[in-house]
Amino acid sequence: MTEAEAAQELARLAGLLAQANLAYHTLDAPEISDADYDALKQRNAEIEARFPHLKRPDSPSEQVGARPGEGFSKVSHAVRMMSLGNAFDDADVADFDRSIRKYLGLDVETALAYTAEPKIDGLSLSLRYEQGVLVQAATRGDGEVGENVTANARTIADIPARIEGAPEVLEVRGEVYMSHADFAALNTRQEAEGGKLFANPRNAAAGSLRQLDAAITRARPLRFFAYSWGELSEPLAETQMQAIERLAGLGFQTNPLTRRCADLDAMIAHYRDIEAQRATLGYDIDGVVYKLDDLGLQARLGFRSTTPRWAIAHKFPAELAWTRLEAIDIQVGRTGALSPVARLTPVTVGGVVVSNATLHNEDYIAGRDSRGQEIRDGKDIRVGDWVQVYRAGDVIPKIADVDLNKRPEGANPFEFPEQCPECGSPAIREEGDAVRRCTGGVICPAQAVEKLKHFVSRAAFDIEGLGAKQVEQFHADGWIREPADIFELRSRYGEGLQQLKNREGWGEKSATNLFQAIDDKRRIPLARLIFALGIRHVGEVGAKDLSLHYRDWDAMAAALDTARLAALAHRAADTAEEQERQQAQAEGRRARISDTRAAVIAAQEVPPEAAAAWADLIGVDGIGATLGLSLSDAFANGDERAAFDRLSAHLTVIPPDAPARDSPVAGKTVVFTGSLEKMTRAEAKARAEALGAKVAGSVSKKTDLLVAGPGAGSKLKTAESLGIETLDEDGWLKLIEGL
């Protein structure tokens, strides 16, 4: 490898690893496997060792985690939260022991004890206690600055709010995780409610901890293992093992498989023991962490730039198996997304029989990622291929590699369908979207079933006795084709009660109860109705924002009708803008974006009332153009609009409570920042809105009041610089007291 090639490869690796860190640590959506990540990092280290003068300022070897997200206030760690070096085999562990002895000047005969503990696959968390009281919880972030998740951490049963007999200042560090059983139960609940399924327990734990609404975190079964510490006002113990035992004595959960190992042989033996138990532990681990037991020697060894010299993670080999890809099936979801699924010759991976694997989208099958870069060295996936399957607690396992040497003669590249396999409608892929979608809408049976499941989910109509299973049965029998049919069941089949009660699994009481439950939902809040429609991009929060803005179903529908021409002009401008950007890039000039948009919109001759209605729609806090276009398309689609109208004829839609107009915050823009100890962020937002305030997510000249809790960061500084009134939580509660 030449210097030029090395520099080019280091730049490529820096970009790949930065994206991987962002996806894993900040977005909670890993894009590559742990094994692939470790391989990239190892290659980067090897090239840097050969060409040290080419080491980049943004070298992955100097990075820990990724920058914190934008949804929480930031916390600076008093003691940096470090990463760990990796060992991939016994020889690496022996090298680790040898390097410690060399650094300390100890020969091979000198006894060195280590602790060995499972490496939990979760999210790192630092808990700060002062005078025995939990005052702050923060994620690792980039090691120096993390996210303040104190309110969420307080909801985790394994995390004590108070501890007795601890140092005045104690930062306890550990891992938030989710057990396999709890993960399966959560996904079952998510599916029944029409919610998003989590890919694996680690993603579920990370996503649950990083909720802006602590009430959501409280409803998720999170656990916590303590294994380390940060800032201390006095030492915990003299050895690592004693310190772990003291943490357990203070009331923290510590891993029962943590052992003190007298020598290298004992470390490897315990690694083998943990590896053998891995499939039966009930939670995910991806290796064993060794730490020098003597804390005095740990202090002498100190740290490298991102890792301690006295600890290392001995990683498990990836759980992999080879099998044959028998078929590729296409499933159609609620929003029309065509999702390919691999049907495999059953194979055991990590103690579990696997017969299906996700293939994500057509790019993944073709050997490309979402940015068009090669994955699997550009190897595509074909029916008949021998594929390498891996799993790490995933709902559906994934394909890691393809053996081209075993590819059957005549195996053809997979042709992703351009028509929906369920209804035959065109399946199109919009610019910038990784997914191809069916355009059939309500005429597509697959979309209809998934939309109906969403409609009856807990966050939508929540009809007792009518869940996903019943929806599938009723749809298959032709009883329910669209939401309006649910409210016609009694009239259509109810002298038909006899028909329903005679079905398998039904009786007179359950049938009567179902009809009553349906009748109970004929009065529905506007926000729930909007969410229940299953319009793409419209979640619970967006539905609530729309309901607060329009306050009436007919008023919202009329506003969308008025705004339609402006919405179409906006889409045409988006298309022209992208074409101009591509053409400018090809011609090596600067794109004239604003001129292009203005010209296209002017050419559409949008009526003023349409422009005003569109501006009003996308100006709703939290809505924007993407959601606005999706909403406009749904109401402009003849079949969908007719279905909406048939449904609304059966309902009495309840407007949201009118916000108070005589409160001290009515008409004001309020921002909350930092930790709130007496209410969740969602409760604070709901209360402020009920009192007539508008709650914003950022501070600007339009902000009237900032409510700042502990850990308030840049928002507080901005408010002070702008002269904006600031209150602490108690001041806010006093302001609204009695209202």
From Swiss-Prot:
Signal peptide: none annotated. PROSITE patterns: BRCT, DNA_LIGASE_N1, DNA_LIGASE_N2. Its EC number is 6.5.1.2. The keyword Lipoprotein does not apply. The active site is at K119 (n6-amp-lysine intermediate). The keyword NADP does not apply. Residues 660-739 form the BRCT domain. Residues 49-70 are annotated as: Disordered. Zn(2+) binds at C420, C423, C438, C444. SMART domains: BRCT, LIGANc. GO terms for cellular component: cytosol. This is DNA ligase. It comes from Ruegeria pomeroyi (strain ATCC 700808 / DSM 15171 / DSS-3). The lineage of its organism: Bacteria, Pseudomonadati, Pseudomonadota, Alphaproteobacteria, Rhodobacterales.
